[in-house]
Amino acid sequence: MADALGMIEVRGFVGMVEAADAMVKAAKVELIGYEKTGGGYVTAVVRGDVAAVKAATEAGQRAAERVGEVVAVHVIPRPHVNVDAALPLGRTPGMDKSA
């Protein structure tokens, strides 16, 4: 099973909560956290199978647009291990899910 990282950046905390709720309800993904980036921008981050993360971010975008402003939506399929080493977003570097 391929792993992916999905992010939705919105303006405002309520929009982020709405997006996060929709993402975890829409597909089998794990909400691994959120990041406040300043200026009212907040990013929700999910992990899971590539197809599930794509479906989740699409659902999250639709939900967040109903209550706020979506700034960006992005999915990184199979992020390189160095991404986890530099930005430990819910994974321990070197961790193999199939083990």
Curated annotation (Swiss-Prot):
Name a GO CC annotation attached to this entry: bacterial microcompartment
Localisation per UniProt entry: Bacterial microcompartment
Q: Where is the BMC domain?
A: 4-88
Pfam families listed in its UniProt record: BMC
Q: Would I find RNA-binding among this entry's keywords? A: no
Keywords (alphabetical) are: Bacterial microcompartment
Gene3D superfamilies from the xrefs?
3.30.70.1710
Q: What happens when the gene is disrupted?
A: Absolutely required for BMC formation; when deleted from an artificial operon (Hoch_5815, Hoch_5812, Hoch_3341, Hoch_5816, Hoch_4425, Hoch_4426, Hoch_5814) being expressed in E.coli, no BMC shells are made.
Indicate the principal place this protein occupies in or around the cell: other
What does the sequence similarity comment in the record state about its family? Answer: Belongs to the bacterial microcompartments protein family.
Query: What does the UniProt record say this protein does?
Result: The only hexameric shell protein in this bacterium, it forms the majority of the bacterial microcompartment (BMC) shell. Expression of 5 proteins in E.coli (BMC-H (Hoch_5815), BMC-P (Hoch_5814), and 3 BMC-T (Hoch_5812, Hoch_5816, Hoch_3341)) forms a 40 nm artificial BMC with a molecular mass of 6.5 MDa. There are 60 BMC-H hexamers per BMC. The shell facets are 20-30 Angstroms thick (a single hexamer layer), with 1 of BMC-T trimers protruding to the exterior.
Tell me the subunit arrangement: Homohexamer with a small central pore. When purified protein is examined by atomic force microscopy it dynamically makes uniform patches about 35 Angstroms thick with hexamers in the same orientation. In the BMC the concave side faces outward, with the N- and C-terminii exposed to the cytoplasm.
User: What is the designated name of this protein?
Assistant: Bacterial microcompartment protein homohexamer
Organism ancestry: Bacteria, Pseudomonadati, Myxococcota, Polyangia, Haliangiales
